[in-house]
């Protein structure tokens, strides 16, 4: 039985982590933490997330006390602000914990991105070099040996899973940049209240065009330029991305289907559609990324959908945990 700690358990993604790890047959949640200024300190998890009443009744502790339990902890999940994770990761690594970081703090190879997009100077360049990017379907061999797994962003997960096979097989026209329109539910902005995410204000609207934090992540990990246009949608959870690309001549639908099948046939959390297209409804509260496509002439529109809190966050983190420790990839997830 592995002892785990979850930091940031009061947030949406953190709560999903608690749910998964509570069900995990080979893990024991030793402690759950919230920030030092949180109003939830000393409250029960089930008081904050009432759907877990009499299921998970662990008590929140302040992050200040996490230094007291560093012994006998096998793994830690960080569902925290980027700057908080930036500071906590070295501490837990020095305590011989395997770290699964859901923030962006260790995703990127280029530390300049953190100043340009996240507003802080990254102080641990060596850890950036040694972290393993936790796109579970593509990095399993590296994840098996990693001490620091940096989980991808929610948008970045959905978009990469849709595009990587086609880029890998070199079927996209080099002269045309993929154009990505993606819509996320308001839970992607976190649990903290804000006017833009309030019931009467939320709408369908684009935001942070060319400046979204996931843009450099997507470009770096795909290795090709893209135009990424994120949108906030009037629903609570889920992401749907429509990606328009130009194909090289004579690429047919059967070729694309065979490519997706080649890479994802034995990947239980990827579902490929042959006749239909994914929707938010098909992935809401599910740990899958669903992918479909339509081709006309030399153009392809790929549609990918996931739950931003699950495959875009907690489910992928637990998937990486399972891979790292040699469990079934879907243990406690499905």
UniProtKB/Swiss-Prot annotation:
InterPro entries: AGPR_AS, AGPR_type-1, NAD(P)-bd_dom_sf, NAGSA_dehydrogenase, Semialdehyde_DH_NAD-bd. The keyword Repressor does not apply. GO terms for cellular component: cytoplasm. Pathway: Amino-acid biosynthesis; L-arginine biosynthesis; N(2)-acetyl-L-ornithine from L-glutamate: step 3/4. Its EC number is 1.2.1.38. GO terms for biological process: L-arginine biosynthetic process. It is found in: Cytoplasm. PROSITE patterns: ARGC (PS01224). The active site is at residue 154. Keywords: Amino-acid biosynthesis, Arginine biosynthesis, Cytoplasm, NADP, Oxidoreductase. Pfam families: Semialdhyde_dh, Semialdhyde_dhC_1. Gene3D superfamilies: Dihydrodipicolinate Reductase, domain 2, NAD(P)-binding Rossmann-like Domain. It catalyses: N-acetyl-L-glutamate 5-semialdehyde + phosphate + NADP(+) = N-acetyl-L-glutamyl 5-phosphate + NADPH + H(+). SMART domains: Semialdhyde_dh. GO terms for molecular function: N-acetyl-gamma-glutamyl-phosphate reductase activity; NAD binding; NADP+ binding. Belongs to the NAGSA dehydrogenase family. Type 1 subfamily. Catalyzes the NADPH-dependent reduction of N-acetyl-5-glutamyl phosphate to yield N-acetyl-L-glutamate 5-semialdehyde. HAMAP family: ArgC_type1 (MF_00150). PANTHER family: N-ACETYL-GAMMA-GLUTAMYL-PHOSPHATE REDUCTASE, CHLOROPLASTIC-RELATED, N-ACETYL-GAMMA-GLUTAMYL-PHOSPHATE REDUCTASE, CHLOROPLASTIC-RELATED-RELATED. This is N-acetyl-gamma-glutamyl-phosphate reductase. It comes from Buchnera aphidicola subsp. Acyrthosiphon pisum (strain APS).
């Amino acid at each position: 039985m592995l002892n785990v700690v979850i930091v940031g358990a009061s947030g949406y993604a953190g709560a999903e982590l608690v749910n998964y790890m509570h069900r995990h047959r080979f893990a024991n949640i030793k402690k759950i933490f919230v920030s030092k200024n949180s109003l939830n300190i000393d409250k029960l998890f089930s008081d904050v997330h009432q759907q877990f009443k009499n299921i998970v009744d662990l008590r929140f502790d302040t992050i200040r006390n996490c230094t007291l339990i560093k012994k006998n902890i096998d793994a830690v999940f960080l569902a925290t602000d980027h700057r908080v994770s930036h500071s906590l990761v070295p501490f837990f690594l020095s305590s011989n914990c395997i770290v699964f970081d859901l923030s962006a703090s260790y995703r990127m190879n280029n530390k300049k991105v953190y100043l340009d997009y996240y507003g802080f100077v990254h102080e641990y360049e060596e850890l950036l070099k040694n972290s393993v990017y936790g796109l579970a379907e593509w990095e399993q061999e590296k994840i098996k040996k990693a001490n620091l797994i940096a989980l991808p962003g929610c948008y970045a997960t959905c978009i990469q899973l849709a595009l990587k096979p086609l880029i890998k097989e070199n079927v996209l026209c080099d002269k045309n940049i993929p154009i990505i329109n993606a819509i996320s539910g308001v839970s992607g902005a976190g649990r903290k209240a804000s006017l833009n995410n309030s019931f009467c204000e939320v709408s369908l609207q684009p935001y942070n065009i060319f400046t979204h934090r996931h843009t450099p992540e997507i470009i770096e990990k795909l290795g090709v330029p893209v135009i990424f246009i994120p949108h906030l949608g009037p629903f609570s959870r889920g992401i749907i991305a429509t990606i328009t690309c130009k194909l090289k001549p004579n690429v047919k639908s059967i070729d694309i289907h065979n490519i997706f099948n080649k890479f994802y046939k034995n990947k239980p959390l990827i579902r490929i559609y042959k006749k239909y297209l994914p929707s938010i409804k098909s992935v809401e509260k599910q740990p899958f990324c669903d992918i479909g496509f339509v081709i006309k002439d030399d153009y392809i529109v790929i549609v990918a959908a996931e739950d931003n809190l699950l495959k875009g966050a907690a489910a992928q983190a637990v998937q990486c945990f399972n891979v790292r420790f040699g469990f079934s990839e879907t243990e406690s997830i499905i």
